[in-house]
């Protein structure tokens, strides 16, 4: 039941992120997915695996207990070059990049003049450049946005030194789960990865393949995202998958978009186009922690004045919250109701049954007075009000690496 629910969510809930074109792009691992029996679907203009024969539930649980491999090569990889790269990028994202040490990564968001979120992004200080990863569904939009902002930046001062490089010859493989570190270490002979901090990046030679590895992920588990030359991507994936087989429950097994979605929802992580969009600000999205004290005070990013006002007490009209529902899972768009008046106070943006807790969990936006943890609300499911409780997120404990 959970597997089918997740697949339906991915395929139906936000159709602008799906392509019906016959000219779907394919990652370097496309044929490998098919050899592994994956169910392929169009996603963000790419042909991607939504699940493998084991099913979404088993893939999800294997990542929580062991390790799973995700092909995330559809995401955009960029480098921002030039001596003014930090000044420039701080003019389009909310992150404090001046304070980001070399080799460290940070989640941030691009904002528009209304303070709305254009996309969320991972930014790494790579020393001589900024390494940036953007969402597949927003990649073309983000690239155009960055190019346009570079032109504006240089028009103010022609001596400004900044440029963007698209890393189109690289694939991106994520391996996630509690046993991932020990498995990866077997393929890395020249360095100790047990002392690698969460949200840091290193060059790494994996089984003789030169890669760039970031300790991060989108599941709530420890894990790594590996930027690898596309010509070597299949070999690397096959090496990881060879640590497991159908007869054993350890090692790295393949996981698709379905498990990726249920894992990130349990972990309380946003999906752009569902839980975030260009009308929602970081403050409404409960992402205040993305904005450092310096950036809150100085601003300097699009929509800063609006965001600064929302940071004040009672300045934010709505908040992203977790919701635990006493019944069937709520789908995107289900209304949140005030039990005392039956008036609409918000909407669900993501929902499923948690494979770990077996509860019906959702993310939603509600009017700020109803956002306190423990608040009782109703959720309208198929026209019927179902009792629910505003919950903290994540819905399950995260297991990020701690030194």
Swiss-Prot record:
Belongs to the GcvT family. It comes from the Eukaryota. The lineage of its organism: Eukaryota, Amoebozoa, Evosea, Eumycetozoa, Dictyostelia. The glycine cleavage system is composed of four proteins: P, T, L and H. Its main location: mitochondrion. One of its GO terms (biological process) is glycine catabolic process. It comes from Dictyostelium discoideum (Social amoeba). This is Aminomethyltransferase, mitochondrial. One of its GO terms (molecular function) is aminomethyltransferase activity. The keyword Cell wall biogenesis/degradation does not apply. The keyword Nucleotide-binding does not apply. PANTHER family: AMINOMETHYLTRANSFERASE, AMINOMETHYLTRANSFERASE, MITOCHONDRIAL.
């Amino acid at each position: 039941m959970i597997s089918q629910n997740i697949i339906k969510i991915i395929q139906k809930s936000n159709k602008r992120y799906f392509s019906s074109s016959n000219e779907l792009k394919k990652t370097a691992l496309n044929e490998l997915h098919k050899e592994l029996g994956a169910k392929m679907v169009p996603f963000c203009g790419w042909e991607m695996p939504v699940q493998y024969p084991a099913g979404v539930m088993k893939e999800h649980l294997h990542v929580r207990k062991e390790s799973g491999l995700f092909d995330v090569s559809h995401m955009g990889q960029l480098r921002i070059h030039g001596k003014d790269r930090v000044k420039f990028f701080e003019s389009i994202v909310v992150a404090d990049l001046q304070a980001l040490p070399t080799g460290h990564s940070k989640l941030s968001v691009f904002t528009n003049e209304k303070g709305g979120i254009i996309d969320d992004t991972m930014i790494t200080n790579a020393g001589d450049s900024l390494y940036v990863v953007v969402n597949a569904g927003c990649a073309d939009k983000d690239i155009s946005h960055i190019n346009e902002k570079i032109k504006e930046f240089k028009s103010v001062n022609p001596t400004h030194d900044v440029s963007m490089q698209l890393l189109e010859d690289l694939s991106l493989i994520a391996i996630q789960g509690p046993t991932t570190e020990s498995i990866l270490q077997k393929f890395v002979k020249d360095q100790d990865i047990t002392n690698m901090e969460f949200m840091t990046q290193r060059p790494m030679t994996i089984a003789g393949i030169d890669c760039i590895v970031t300790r991060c992920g989108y599941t709530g588990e420890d894990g790594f995202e590996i930027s690898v030359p596309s010509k070597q991507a299949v070999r690397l994936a096959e090496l990881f998958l060879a640590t497991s087989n159908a007869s054993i429950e350890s090692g790295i097994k393949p996981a698709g978009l379905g498990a990726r979605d249920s894992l990130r929802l349990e972990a309380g992580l946003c999906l752009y186009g569902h839980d975030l969009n260009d009308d929602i600000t970081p403050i409404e999205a409960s992402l205040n922690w993305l904005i450092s004290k310096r950036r809150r005070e100085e601003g300097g990013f699009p929509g800063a004045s609006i965001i600064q006002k929302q940071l004040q007490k009672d300045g934010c009209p709505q908040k992203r919250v977790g919701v635990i529902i006493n019944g069937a899972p709520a789908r995107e768009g289900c209304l949140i109701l005030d039990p005392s008046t039956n008036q609409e106070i918000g909407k669900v943006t993501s929902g499923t049954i948690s494979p770990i807790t077996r509860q019906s969990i959702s993310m939603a936006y509600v009017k700020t007075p109803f956002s306190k943890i423990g608040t009782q609300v109703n959720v309208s499911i198929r026209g019927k009000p179902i009792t629910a409780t505003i919950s903290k997120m994540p819905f399950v404990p995260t297991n990020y690496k701690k030194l």
